[in-house]
A protein has these predicted regions:
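Alpha-helical scaffolding segments of alpha/beta enzyme cores, especially the outer helices
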Residues: 63-66, 88-99, 115, 119-122, ...
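Conserved radical SAM core fold
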Residues: 25-28, 83-85, 111-117, 127-144, ...
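Structural preference for beta-strand elements that scaffold enzyme active sites
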Residues: 75-77, 103-105, 126-128, 163-165, ...
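Helix C-cap/helix->beta junction micro-motif
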Residues: 71, 100, 160, 192-194, ...
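Conserved Radical SAM active-site core
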Residues: 1-126
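Short glycine-enriched, charge-decorated loop/helix-capping segments at active-site entrances
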Residues: 50-54, 140-146, 212-213
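Conserved glycine-rich "GG(E/T)P / GGGxP" loop and the immediately following alpha-helix
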Residues: 69-92, 138-151, 168-183, 189
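Auxiliary Fe-S-binding modules of radical SAM enzymes
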Residues: 173-288
Length: 288
């Protein structure tokens, strides 16, 4: 793997009942100002900065890129809240990062109109898109959002050649129905293709859904099985440390494990120039 410099601002376009970052995503920027003093403007050199210093910075795009360079990060990830809420800042930073040879990774709910998505997509190297369910009623009840714009975003990213992976948080009583998961996987196979990874993540009680239990592992295994039956070649299970092969990438041809993982660590890597070391089949993804 490689190092990514992650950042966010306050605010989000959704109101997810289960948000794990609600302390920043459900607040305005002025509500998250550091209480220790006025904002500081970043000035080089950055080598002497501490975490406390960074917490008080008013960072312009050039500051973000400078810090990413100083930390020798291969990419910048726009994450934690929702980059759509600070679109212009994300766009300007992405553009500058591309000029400086740093990759851009967008972590998003996907609720964006097509024109700005295409404008931003020119500077994206990868994206993580949350597909929070496959029912309009559930989307509104759980997230105060709509499903169709997210499906449009997936199609747009695919048409632009931006690599993306899909995350589906399986929330008990909301998005854990096998029929919903099956319809979602069938749609992805037909409209996006078999090579886009999908991660079924385990829900843990958060924010306004603290009375719900964590997602049963059996439900996640069933979701993974449904995805594979629908023809999706790379189906994973997330947020379940220690679950055997939950995060392993298998070659779709010879079925050998080509990338093994333990939470955030890569424990085995059997690819050569993006191809399976055992049978030379091309494995979808970004491997450089």
């Amino acid at each position: 793997g490689s190092l990514s410099f992650s950042l966010a601002t306050a605010g989000c376009v959704f109101r997810c009942l289960n948000c794990q970052n609600w302390e920043i995503s459900q607040k305005k920027p002025e509500e998250t100002k550091d209480p220790r003093g006025p904002e500081l403007r970043l000035r080089p050199p950055v080598a002497g900065l501490t975490a406390a210093d960074v917490a008080r910075l008013s960072m312009f795009p050039e500051d973000v890129v400078a810090l990413a360079q100083w930390t020798k990060s291969a990419s910048i990830s726009y994450t934690y809240s929702e980059p759509t809420a600070y679109y212009e800042y994300t766009y300007d930073t992405c553009k500058l990062a591309r000029e400086r040879g740093i990759k851009n990774v967008l972590v998003t709910c996907g609720s964006m109109e097509e024109p700005p998505m295409r404008d931003l997509g020119r500077y994206l190297d990868a994206a993580h898109v949350d597909l929070k369910g496959f029912d309009e009623g559930v989307y509104w009840k759980l997230n105060a959002g709509r499903l169709q714009p997210i499906l449009k975003t997936l199609k747009t990213l695919k048409s632009m050649g931006v690599w993306f992976e899909i995350i589906n948080l399986v929330v008990p009583t909301y998005t854990d129905k096998p029929d919903m998961i099956r319809r979602m996987c069938d749609w992805l196979a037909a409209n996006i293709g078999p090579d886009q990874p999908i991660h079924f993540s385990r829900f843990h009680p958060q924010h306004k859904l603290q009375t719900l239990p964590p997602t049963p592992v059996e439900i996640l295994l069933q979701a993974q099985s449904i995805a594979r039956s629908a023809g999706l070649r790379y189906a994973y299970i997330g947020n379940v440390p220690g679950l055997r092969d939950a995060e392993t990438t298998f070659c779709p041809n010879c079925k050998r494990a080509v990338v093994t993982r333990d939470v955030f660590a890569i424990t085995g890597f059997y690819l050569n120039a993006g191809r399976c070391s055992f049978c030379q089949t091309k494995i979808a993804g970004i491997w450089s």
